[in-house]
Amino acid sequence: MNLENYLPVILFILVGVGVGVAPQVLGFLLGPRRPYAAKNSPYECGFEAFEDARMKFDVRYYLVAILFILFDLEIAFLFPWAVSLREIGATGFWAMMIFLGILVVGFVYEWKKGALDWE
């Protein structure tokens, strides 16, 4: 195996990491450090904070976010499948039907458990 073929990929990764890290390091090293009370105080739309910033969120928000990610991922798999359906034939069709069936079973389970009810 010839590792010279991977040199452009490694160089690309190093340049990408450098572009992301260099401004952060330069800002930390060259930026002014003059903290004072007003700068370190919490800010809430021009007013003093009314309550503690660490409020509890309802678990349903997180559950809806996770469900959104799952079904968004389903669409990410569904689009390339639909584009290449003619090339993959019946095997690809039935593989996607099994995948969609598993997701539908999961969706029905979440619905029956009441994960989508806000009451």
Swiss-Prot record:
Task: Specify the superkingdom.
Answer: Bacteria
Classify the main location: membrane
Report the subcellular localization: Cell inner membrane
Q: What is this protein called?
A: NADH-quinone oxidoreductase subunit A
- Subunit-level organization: NDH-1 is composed of 14 different subunits. Subunits NuoA, H, J, K, L, M, N constitute the membrane sector of the complex.
Provide any one GO MF term from the record. NADH dehydrogenase (ubiquinone) activity
Q: Which Pfam families match?
A: Oxidored_q4
Protein EC: 7.1.1.-
Q: What topology does it adopt in the membrane?
A: Multi-pass membrane protein
What the record says about family reads: Belongs to the complex I subunit 3 family.
Keyword Electron transport present in the record's keywords: the answer is: no
InterPro entries, alphabetized: NAD(P)H_OxRDtase_bac/plastid, NADH_UbQ/plastoQ_OxRdtase_su3, NDAH_ubi_oxred_su3_sf
Chain's role:
NDH-1 shuttles electrons from NADH, via FMN and iron-sulfur (Fe-S) centers, to quinones in the respiratory chain. The immediate electron acceptor for the enzyme in this species is believed to be ubiquinone. Couples the redox reaction to proton translocation (for every two electrons transferred, four hydrogen ions are translocated across the cytoplasmic membrane), and thus conserves the redox energy in a proton gradient.
What's the source species for this entry?
Answer: Leptothrix cholodnii (strain ATCC 51168 / LMG 8142 / SP-6) (Leptothrix discophora (strain SP-6))
Alphabetically ordered keywords of this record: Cell inner membrane, Cell membrane, Membrane, NAD, Quinone, Translocase, Transmembrane, Transmembrane helix, Transport, Ubiquinone
Main enzyme class: translocase
Membrane-crossing ranges are 9-29, 63-83, 88-108
Catalytic activity line of the entry? a quinone + NADH + 5 H(+)(in) = a quinol + NAD(+) + 4 H(+)(out)
* Any single Gene Ontology cellular-component annotation: NADH dehydrogenase complex
